[in-house]
């Protein structure tokens, strides 16, 4: 690959080797004025990932190519310092999506070479690609559109036939997986932590604001902090841009509908998911909500366990057989605690009132005695 091309795909083995051969020290990347543009671009791509989209424009010229290439390792340092699993997922997803915008326009030979870097053995013929079904399953597993199911594909001699665009989409998943699995970084050098600290703090603060907005505004009167662990886990994954398994997606959606969230509110939760399709998602939510005449309750705990969706079990879970029962119990406990606190406050106000009244009576009595 030429250097200009490597700048679009800085997570490849070839790009990593190219940067390594430049012989640029960590100290230089962090402090040298020569790489100021690379640092600025690295900060920019992490901030853009926070918003959901890393914008990449065509690069030309040695200086621009170098800045784009070096911005990736600097961005990785920054993400490592943020040290938040959800944010790491969001960053990996944004990088993969940005790569896909270029991958879908590449020629078949380039895509085959690119796939080989990720251990994907494939062939192309007559604008179609074929890949081994094990690779297909590995990278299509997180894609929830029914068209990706193996049962909806032609399997011949262990190979799956797909279009160029579909192959590019699977390569996007390979990119996302590689980046996501490269975190957390085992040991961050002290000089990196020191340099990245102010930028990491800013990104953390912005991400926390996003999470709080997600947790309060979007839910209205619903109390997400009282959700059972399984639903809280599903929401955290959605927020991190992770596609849920169909069974967990149904469980979460039906739960949220039953606790009072609207169809539009739930739709907004999914708009960060990979392959988000507003029309299809809306249809699925409305179907669960009862648009066809059948309303659905979320699965019971036994069913959640059967499908591997029982996550983070706590003490209350031991006494509960249904996610809705968990939420109702939590709401009851919280309301009771609120009533008790209010009762104590009212009792304190009465005691204060009595003390004031007794004080007034004492003053009057003293005046009379005088």
From Swiss-Prot:
Binds 1 [4Fe-4S] cluster. InterPro entries: DNA_primase_lsu_euk/arc, DNA_primase_lsu_PriL. This is DNA primase large subunit PriL. One of its GO terms (molecular function) is DNA-directed RNA polymerase activity. Regulatory subunit of DNA primase, an RNA polymerase that catalyzes the synthesis of short RNA molecules used as primers for DNA polymerase during DNA replication. Stabilizes and modulates the activity of the small subunit, increasing the rate of DNA synthesis, and conferring RNA synthesis capability. The DNA polymerase activity may enable DNA primase to also catalyze primer extension after primer synthesis. May also play a role in DNA repair. It comes from Methanosarcina mazei (strain ATCC BAA-159 / DSM 3647 / Goe1 / Go1 / JCM 11833 / OCM 88) (Methanosarcina frisia). One of its GO terms (biological process) is DNA replication initiation. Keywords: 4Fe-4S, DNA replication, Iron, Iron-sulfur, Metal-binding, Primosome. Coiled coil: none annotated. [4Fe-4S] cluster binds at residues 230, 301, 310, 317. Belongs to the eukaryotic-type primase large subunit family. The keyword Iron-sulfur applies. Its cofactor is [4Fe-4S] cluster. GO terms for cellular component: primosome complex. The keyword Iron-sulfur applies. It holds the Pfam family DNA_primase_lrg. Residues 337-370 are annotated as: Disordered. Heterodimer of a small subunit (PriS) and a large subunit (PriL).
């Amino acid at each position: 690959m030429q250097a200009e091309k490597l700048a679009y795909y800085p997570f490849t083995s070839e790009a990593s080797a190219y940067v390594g051969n430049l012989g640029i020290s960590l100290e230089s990347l962090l402090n040298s004025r020569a790489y100021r543009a690379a640092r600025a671009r690295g900060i920019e791509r992490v901030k853009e990932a926070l918003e959901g989209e890393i914008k990449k424009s065509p690069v030309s010229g040695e200086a621009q190519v170098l800045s784009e290439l070096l911005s990736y390792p600097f961005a990785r340092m920054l993400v490592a310092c943020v040290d938040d699993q959800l944010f790491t997922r969001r960053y990996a997803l944004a990088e993969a999506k940005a790569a896909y915008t270029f991958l879908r326009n590449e020629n078949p030979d380039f895509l085959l070479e690119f796939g080989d870097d990720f251990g994907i053995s494939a062939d192309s013929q007559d604008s179609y690609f074929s890949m081994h079904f094990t690779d297909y399953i590995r990278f299509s597993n997180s894609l929830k559109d029914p068209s990706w199911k193996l049962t909806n594909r032609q399997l011949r001699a262990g190979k799956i036939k797909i279009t160029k665009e579909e192959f590019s989409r699977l390569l996007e998943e390979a990119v996302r997986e590689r980046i996501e699995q490269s975190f957390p970084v085992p040991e961050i050098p002290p000089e990196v932590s020191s340099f990245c600290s102010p930028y990491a703090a800013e990104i953390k603060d912005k991400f926390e604001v996003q999470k709080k907005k997600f947790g309060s505004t979007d839910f209205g009167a619903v109390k997400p902090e009282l959700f059972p662990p399984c639903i809280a886990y599903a929401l955290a994954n959605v927020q991190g841009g992770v596609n849920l398994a169909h069974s967990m997606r149904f469980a979460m959606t039906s739960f949220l509908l039953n606790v009072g969230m609207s169809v539009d509110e739930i739709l907004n939760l999914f708009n960060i998911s990979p392959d988000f399709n507003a029309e299809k998602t809306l249809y699925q939510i409305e179907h669960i909500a009862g648009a066809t005449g059948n309303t659905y309750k979320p699965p019971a705990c036994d069913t959640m366990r059967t499908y591997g969706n029982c996550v983070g079990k706590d003490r209350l879970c031991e006494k509960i057989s249904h996610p809705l029962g968990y939420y109702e119990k939590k709401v009851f406990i919280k309301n009771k605690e609120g009533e008790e606190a209010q009762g104590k406050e009212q009792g304190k106000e009465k005691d204060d009132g009595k003390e004031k009244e007794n004080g007034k009576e004492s003053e009057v009595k003293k005046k009379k005695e005088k």
